[in-house]
Amino acid sequence: MRTAIIAGNWKMNKTVKEAVELVKELKPLVKDAKCDVVVCPTYVCLPAVLEEVKGSNIKVGAQNMHFEESGAYTGEIAPKMLEELGVHYVIIGHSERRQYFNETDETVNKKVKKAFEHNLIPIVCCGESLEEREGNITEKVLEGQIKVGLKELSKEQVEKLVIAYEPIWAIGTGKTATDEQANETIGYIRTVVKAMYGESVADKIRIQYGGSVKPGTIKAQMAKEEIDGALVGGASLKAEDFAAIVNY
């Protein structure tokens, strides 16, 4: 039985003060959650948020990291910096990173490997665009992303990581993936993992859905057998909304 995981990706939102207020408000609302609860603030908010969640059931993730240990990479953050802070998870390969910052499946793979070296659990994002969905190449695209992004890992590592399926065509387009579409596509992703690492690993890996998740959509989504949680964007910026999703 896979434990559900619901993570809030705050993206480029919240000052340090606002971030602390948000988690302070969130703590009592999610204290009885039956799933793993994760918040992913910006880098500058990480120390304050980590301090605020101490003693609670909320874990903290980063939104990205570099694949090198250190060096001349202006504006980047190394994995050991996150590890030293006490960060637990790291989002890798989010569609916005791929779209605006030229993230590729190869860099995703480098980051995933490096995350494990520093005791960070990767939340690896994958998903297809509207053109790809309408061109009926969703499976081909996802297979490519997973086969490259998760190559050359140990079975133990793959069991630990989290995959987030985010249909890019359902983000800010007015189009939404039905629960059936989400479940079916996540089921397909699981078959790709099975082909790479075996049935036992595929049965254990947790795969989230991340396409405009709201308090009103989560219950039906979580009722689907393949969906193991959610990567939540906008709705994670309000404690009440995020708590409603966590306590589905």
Swiss-Prot record:
What Pfam families has UniProt attached to this entry? TIM (PF00121)
NCBIfam families attached to this UniProt entry: tim (TIGR00419)
- Domain of life, per the record? Bacteria
Matches recorded under Gene3D superfamilies: Aldolase class I
- What does the UniProt function comment say about this protein? Involved in the gluconeogenesis. Catalyzes stereospecifically the conversion of dihydroxyacetone phosphate (DHAP) to D-glyceraldehyde-3-phosphate (G3P).
Extract the PROSITE patterns matched here: TIM_1, TIM_2
List the InterPro entries: Aldolase_TIM (IPR013785), TIM_sf (IPR035990), TrioseP_Isoase_bac/euk (IPR022896), Triosephosphate_isomerase (IPR000652), Triosephosphate_isomerase_AS (IPR020861)
Catalytic residues as annotated in Swiss-Prot or TrEMBL: H94 (electrophile), E166 (proton acceptor)
Localized where?
Answer: Cytoplasm
The name on file for this protein is Triosephosphate isomerase
Q: Which residues bind substrate?
A: N9, W10, K11, G172, S212, G233, G234
Alphabetic keyword roster: Cytoplasm, Gluconeogenesis, Glycolysis, Isomerase
Origin organism is Clostridium botulinum (strain ATCC 19397 / Type A)
Assembly behavior: Homodimer.
Catalytic activity annotation: D-glyceraldehyde 3-phosphate = dihydroxyacetone phosphate
Task: For this entry, list what GO says about its biological process.
Answer: gluconeogenesis; glyceraldehyde-3-phosphate biosynthetic process; glycerol catabolic process; glycolytic process
Which protein family is named in the record? Belongs to the triosephosphate isomerase family.
Gene Ontology CC terms, in alphabetical order: cytosol
- Enzyme Commission number, as recorded: 5.3.1.1
Where it mainly occurs, coarsely classed, is cytoplasm
User: What does the record give as its pathway?
Assistant: Carbohydrate biosynthesis; gluconeogenesis; Carbohydrate degradation; glycolysis; D-glyceraldehyde 3-phosphate from glycerone phosphate: step 1/1
Q: Which GO terms describe its molecular function?
A: triose-phosphate isomerase activity
